[in-house]
UniProtKB/Swiss-Prot annotation:
SUPFAM superfamilies listed in its UniProt record: Small protein B (SmpB)
Entry protein name: SsrA-binding protein
Family in the record: Belongs to the SmpB family.
Subcellular location: Cytoplasm
GO-annotated cellular components: cytosol
InterPro entries hit by this protein: SmpB (IPR023620), SsrA-bd_prot (IPR000037), SsrA-bd_prot_CS (IPR020081)
Gene Ontology molecular functions: RNA binding
Biological process terms in GO annotation: trans-translation
Location of region: Disordered: 144-167
Protein role: Required for rescue of stalled ribosomes mediated by trans-translation. Binds to transfer-messenger RNA (tmRNA), required for stable association of tmRNA with ribosomes. tmRNA and SmpB together mimic tRNA shape, replacing the anticodon stem-loop with SmpB. tmRNA is encoded by the ssrA gene; the 2 termini fold to resemble tRNA(Ala) and it encodes a 'tag peptide', a short internal open reading frame. During trans-translation Ala-aminoacylated tmRNA acts like a tRNA, entering the A-site of stalled ribosomes, displacing the stalled mRNA.
Keywords, comma-separated and alphabetical: Cytoplasm, RNA-binding
Native organism: Synechococcus sp. (strain CC9902)
Length: 167
């Protein structure tokens, strides 16, 4: 009986390790109101994979464009791998191709035709052994929208702490 519990716990730990977050763009959720998200694959070279698995990716200034019917990721910094020579290492800010179905790209193109919408990378994560990136269609927030969102977030936090205090 105890062995079954150990096996289940080990399987749950393996699933959690197989779906872990590698990089997160927390600033994007502050600067943009995310309307829709999409999980895509990303075309990488070997040293980029090693750097991402070591947690050396920065999504903060990144954005996505649709060019020639392809999704492209721009301005995302993936540090060069520390144990690779300069000859084999990659360019940290190179443009990377995102892998999505044609109908998903067409749907995104239709949404981006609306004024004020942008494609923003939200996070890089593992799904099994594959590296995936979640992108979001976002509408830029004005300063007063950011302040209102911060005020609402603060009030929810205070309510939660008050509820926890009296329970």
């Amino acid at each position: 009986m105890a062995k079954g519990g150990v096996k289940k716990a080990a399987a749950a730990a393996a699933r959690a390790a197989a779906n872990r977050l590698m990089a997160d763009n927390r600033q994007a959720r502050h600067q943009y109101e995310i309307l829709e998200t999409l999980e895509t694959g990303i075309e990488l070279v070997g040293t980029e994979v090693k750097s991402i698995r070591n947690g050396k990716a920065n999504l903060r200034d990144g954005f996505c464009l649709i060019r020639n019917g392809e999704l492209q990721l721009h301005n995302v910094h993936i540090s060069p791998h520390s144990h690779a020579s300069a000859y084999f290492n990659h360019d940290p800010l190179r443009t990377r191709k995102l892998l999505a179905h044609r109908r998903e790209i067409d749907k995104l193109r239709g949404q981006l035709d609306k004024k004020g919408l942008a494609l923003i990378p939200l996070n890089i994560h593992l799904k099994g052994s594959w590296i995936k990136i979640t992108i979001g269609v976002g509408k830029g927030r004005k300063l007063h929208d950011k302040r209102a969102a911060d005020k609402e977030k603060q009030s929810k936090k205070e309510v939660r702490s008050a509820m926890a205090k009296y329970q």
